């Protein structure tokens, strides 16, 4: 077994992660139904409930601020024992004054789920918190409320990167967060494969995540750490955008070198195809759209047939850790689709020269960058995952051919491509927007092609961050941040820009 532990940091991260967990729950099969290709033990852990019954809950830690959990309780129906007797006041014989916050009323969706009835349709107006559309029970240890800050507070906003950095330091000094929160989950694993972290990177959660990842690297050494770094894509006032940009620069500088995979995600993306209907002001809707790509591209990591996803990401030399997230929603009739993808049980590396290269440059949805000029960028490595349709058949290559092709590709600075095919289509759940996709689909399922791409666009992005940091970051931090961003940028230029410069000479 190769388990993955998830960490969810903050409101936006929890919106996305809730869609992710709802999708995992939808893959369960019961009774005599055909066994799914998904290995549920990767993300779920067995346990014992309060009444002695067996439970199966996500391997996850959910961090959020006071007031951010909505109606979700730490102790749910699986772990809460009813008490028949009054425990009394113990040694205290004085008068008790108990103050309780007004509980948040569960959404109609949650009420119907609890009663085992078909849930009503959700809308942007009825979703107030990420817990309003949650379909799972979590272990009490998974729920971690940070009481130092309150959601949407005007007095103490959780916005500055340094605030999150300081908060983690204070909490870790007092409690040792890894020992208190993470270690119980890690000790349950037979063979921990990776730590997956959802976080926003342009606010205080970026600073909190940076400290957390630093501790993870110290504790877990060479274990894979995958970071999904959410960035606000909505337009805000100029001074707020500048603060966001500074936070993003600090996050990518501090987190990406410590990660095995760092994926910046624009929420929502700048451009949308006409086939997608999206309420860009609804976090529920925008995170649902992101989940179609994020959940699809990581699907190989939770199949019963093991796939070496980490090697696919490493590419030729393992130097590229910042990847772009891209996707397309494909029509039900895939007879005209020519993009080859393959079964994980028959993996092959594919690459060729010039225009015949099978890497894909243009996608309908680009979740990482808002630069439309992608045609001139150099692609170092790309991992494609297609689901719900049959790939083109290809002539198998021998191991000798693959070795030769690999050497030729490396010598010619050609991109590396790994592609997977999974027949399991993407399900449209009742916890997701129903009319987001106009593409025709049967049984509320769609075909998706998603990709993680390491390209020279990252160098362009980092160069802009360097320039911004040089102008607005304080003197004490400026040199370290600018130099650090420059060092990261160089790995997204080496191998093709240097060759071009040499030819010019």
Curated annotation (Swiss-Prot):
InterPro entries hit by this protein: DML1/Misato (IPR049942), DML1/Misato_tubulin (IPR029209), Misato_II_tubulin-like (IPR019605), Tubulin/FtsZ_GTPase_sf (IPR036525)
Highest taxon of source: Eukaryota
Region (Disordered): 330-358
Alphabetical GO biological process terms: mitochondrion organization
Keyword terms, alphabetized: Mitochondrion
Predominant place of localization: mitochondrion
Residues annotated as transmembrane: none
Subcellular location(s) per record: Mitochondrion
GO CC, any one term: mitochondrion
Disulfide topology: none
Annotated function: Involved in the partitioning of the mitochondrial organelle and mitochondrial DNA (mtDNA) inheritance.
Protein family: Belongs to the misato family.
Name of the protein: Protein dml1
């Amino acid at each position: 077994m190769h388990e993955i532990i998830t960490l969810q940091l903050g409101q936006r991260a929890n919106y996305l992660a809730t869609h992710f967990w709802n999708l995992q729950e939808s893959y369960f099969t019961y009774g005599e139904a055909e066994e799914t290709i998904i290995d549920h033990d990767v993300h779920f852990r067995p346990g014992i409930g309060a009444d002695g019954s067996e439970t199966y809950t996500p391997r996850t830690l959910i961090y959020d601020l006071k007031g951010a959990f909505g109606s979700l309780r730490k102790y749910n129906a699986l772990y809460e024992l009813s008490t028949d007797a009054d425990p009394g006041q113990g040694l205290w014989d004085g008068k008790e004054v108990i103050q309780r916050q007004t509980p948040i009323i569960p959404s109609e969706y949650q009420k119907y789920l609890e009663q085992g009835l078909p849930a009503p349709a959700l809308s942007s107006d009825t979703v107030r918190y990420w817990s309003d559309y949650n379909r799972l029970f979590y272990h009490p240890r998974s729920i971690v409320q940070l009481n130092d800050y309150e959601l949407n507070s005007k007095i103490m906003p959780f916005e500055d990167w340094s605030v999150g950095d300081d908060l983690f330091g204070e909490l870790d000094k007092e409690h040792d967060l890894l020992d208190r929160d993470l270690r119980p989950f890690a000790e349950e694993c037979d063979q921990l494969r990776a730590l997956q972290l959802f976080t926003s990177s342009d606010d205080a959660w970026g600073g909190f995540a940076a400290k957390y990842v630093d501790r993870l690297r110290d504790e877990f050494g060479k274990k894979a750490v995958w970071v999904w770094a959410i960035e606000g894509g909505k337009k805000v006032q100029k001074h707020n955008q500048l603060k966001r940009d500074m936070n993003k620069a600090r996050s990518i500088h501090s987190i990406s070198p410590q990660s095995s995979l760092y994926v910046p995600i624009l929420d929502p993306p700048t451009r949308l195809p006409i086939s997608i209907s999206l309420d860009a002001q609804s976090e529920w809707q925008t995170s649902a759209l992101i989940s179609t790509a994020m959940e699809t591209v990581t699907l190989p990591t939770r199949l019963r047939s093991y796939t070496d996803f980490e090697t696919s990401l490493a590419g030729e030399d393992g130097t590229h850790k910042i990847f772009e997230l891209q996707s397309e929603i494909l029509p039900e009739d895939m007879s005209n689709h020519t993009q080859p993808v393959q079964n994980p049980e028959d993996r092959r590396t594919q690459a060729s020269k010039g225009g015949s290269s099978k890497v894909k440059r243009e996608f309908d949805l680009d979740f990482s960058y808002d630069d439309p000029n992608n045609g001139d960028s150099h692609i170092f490595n790309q991992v494609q995952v297609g689901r719900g349709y049959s790939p083109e058949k290809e002539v198998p290559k021998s191991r000798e051919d693959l070795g030769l092709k690999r050497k030729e590709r490396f010598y010619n600075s050609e991109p590396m491509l790994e592609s997977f095919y999974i027949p399991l289509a993407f399900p449209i759940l009742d916890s997701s927007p129903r009319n987001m996709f106009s593409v025709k689909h049967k049984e509320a399922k769609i075909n998706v092609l998603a990709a993680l791409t390491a390209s020279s666009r990252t160098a362009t992005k980092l160069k802009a961050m360097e320039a911004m940091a040089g102008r607005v970051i304080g003197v004490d931090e400026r040199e370290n941040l600018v130099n650090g961003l420059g060092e990261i940028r160089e790995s997204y230029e080496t191998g093709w820009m240097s060759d071009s410069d040499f030819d010019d000479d």
